Structures are given as C-alpha cells and as structure tokens.
From Swiss-Prot:
An example Gene Ontology CC term for this record: hemoglobin complex
Modified residues (N6-acetyllysine): K60, K83, K145
Intrachain S-S bonds: none
UniProt xrefs under Gene3D superfamilies: Globins
UniProt-recorded name of the protein: Hemoglobin subunit beta
Protein's job: Involved in oxygen transport from the lung to the various peripheral tissues.
Residue list for modification S-nitrosocysteine: C94
One Gene Ontology term of the molecular function aspect: haptoglobin binding
Any Pfam family matching the protein: Globin
Similarity comment text for this entry: Belongs to the globin family.
PANTHER family found in the cross-reference section: HEMOGLOBIN FAMILY MEMBER, HEMOGLOBIN SUBUNIT BETA
Annotated CDD domains: Hb-beta-like
Oligomeric form and interacting partners: Heterotetramer of two alpha chains and two beta chains.
Amino acid sequence: MTLLSAEENAHVTSLWGKVDVEKVGGEALGRLLVVYPWTQRFFESFGDLSSPSAVMGNPKVKAHGKKVLSAFSEGLHHLDNLKGTFAQLSELHCDKLHVDPQNFTLLGNVLVVVLAEHFGNAFSPAVQAAFQKVVAGVANALAHKYH
C-alpha cells in the first residue's frame, strides 16, 4: 500500500494524465538497459542491444517499455492494493524469469529521470517526491513474491 497525501495524489494524477505511455515507457526501459547493461540478459530475444543507439531505437524495447508502463499506469488506479495488483507479475518475474528484484527499483528511478526530462519545470521537487513514493511502492509490490 502506498499512502499519498491528497496533494501528492493530485501531483501524480495531474502529471500522469499528460504522459505518453508509449514514448516514456520505451525510453525508460531503453535507459535501464543502457545505464544498467546487466539487465540486458533478460532481453536477449530482443535482437540488437549492442550500443545505446541500438537499444534506444530497438522496436522490441519500445514495445515492451509501453507494456511495462501500461501495467504501471494500471497500478496508479490501485495504490491501496499494489501487492494484489502486481501479484501475478511478481510471481512471473520471481518464479519464471528470475529477475533480481533490485531491478524494479532501478527501473522506477529511471522512470523518474525520464519524467523529469519530459516535463522539465512541471516536474517540481514536490512532484518528484510523490512519484518516488509511487515507484517505491510498485517496486516493493513487484518484489513481494521474493519474500
């Protein structure tokens, strides 16, 4: 459960309504794979990940980034039950894909960087603080099956 104040909730809701999920999702996943190259091992089937430009231009990275951010977006509607919302994804990533749960935190932090880049001054420290709470809550929910 992620508890946001009314003001924090308003920050998240207002900004998220302006997010291009496809663009931001692709960029966030791409940056994760570039900045933390060991995460690429989970995406070997995506083809060319040999350079930053190859990763950022890879259509499979963009498509999966959209899928990831669409799931994140769904979670924003269930902040009071993130563990339930992400239970199946947590189980998949834990039992089948064997993803290091720390990667969820890394992706959340990369998402915050991408949002800051896209929204500039509108992504104020207060907005960032609200999003940091949300991405931490989502990362915790996705890591739930690991405990």
